[in-house]
Amino acid sequence: MDGKLRADEVAVTKSIIKSSFEMWMDLIEVDVVIVGGGPSGLTAAKYLAEKGVKTLVLERHLSFGGGTWGGGMGFPNIVVEKPADEILRSAGIKLKSVDGEPELFTADSVEVPAKLGVAAIDAGAKILTGIVVEDLILKEDKISGVVIQSYSIEKAGLHVDPITISAKYVIDSTGHDASVVSTLARKNKDLGIEVPGEKSMWAEKGENSLTRNTREIFPGLFVCGMTANAYHAGYRMGAIFGGMYLSGKKCAELILEKLNK
């Protein structure tokens, strides 16, 4: 269909600035900030938002999904096991049975983060990309929010002061680096927090330890996903993701209990 499109430059700029300002004013105070939009973070966001919790996901890259997109060594599939498959099915993700392995399923490594992200957004969560958490708000021995910066500014090495977001709870789902907990430990050595990092691969051990390691490790700060195993020196798992999704769900449930939702 041919037609005349209206594309006034000033109107475009005004629209972006106005809507962005309104968005930021609404996000300065939230219930939960999730740092890292990988598999566990997106899952936690979905379950929190479904219960009406004001949830904000901050992802440093321009796309969410973490390491899911690349599947296993670039092969575009991931593996998920029972009962975590139900989490993906609830987001409308198609799964394929594995011959001879009744507990295992494969899923498209592009479809999974795309649909899980949409499920979180549709539930009411807000996802912001290109934002890095460089510090935490620590008041009276409790985490009360995050200190954020543009990832582009950080990468450029520019000296620009950050801004803050207030939150009742913060989730570190940044993955292997456990960057939020590591920042807390580095800047507040008197707290005695250490991040030993994950061990080498042992898929079954790593998967089964994820939900056990998902917990509040400091007042107001939760760990889930690979951050939980990095903090507790658990094993890595590779391209099997069931534990990640179950960890995200458990983290949401723990916070919902705190919020009495």
Curated annotation (Swiss-Prot):
Q: Which UniProt keywords apply?
A: Iron, Metal-binding, NAD, Thiamine biosynthesis, Transferase
GO MF terms, alphabetically ordered:
iron ion binding; pentosyltransferase activity
Question: Which Pfam families does the record match to this protein?
Answer: Thi4
Residues noted as binding NAD(+) in the record, renumbered to the chain: 40, 59-60, 67, 133, 159-161, 179, 226
Entry annotated with the keyword Ribosomal protein: no
What is the required cofactor set for this protein? Fe(2+)
Q: What class of enzyme is it?
A: transferase
Task: Name the EC number(s).
Answer: 2.4.2.59
Q: Pathway of this protein?
A: Cofactor biosynthesis; thiamine diphosphate biosynthesis
Describe the reaction catalysed, as an equation: hydrogen sulfide + glycine + NAD(+) = ADP-5-ethyl-4-methylthiazole-2-carboxylate + nicotinamide + 3 H2O + H(+)
Binding-site residues, Fe cation: 161, 176
Residues bound to glycine are: 236
Outline the subunit composition.
Homooctamer; tetramer of dimers.
**Free-text function comment from the UniProt entry:** Involved in the biosynthesis of the thiazole moiety of thiamine. Catalyzes the conversion of NAD and glycine to adenosine diphosphate 5-(2-hydroxyethyl)-4-methylthiazole-2-carboxylate (ADT), an adenylated thiazole intermediate, using free sulfide as a source of sulfur.
Entries under NCBIfam families matching the protein: sulfide-dependent adenosine diphosphate thiazole synthase
Give the UniProt family note.
Belongs to the THI4 family.
* Protein name, UniProt field: Thiamine thiazole synthase
Instruction: Tell me what gene encodes this.
Output: thi4
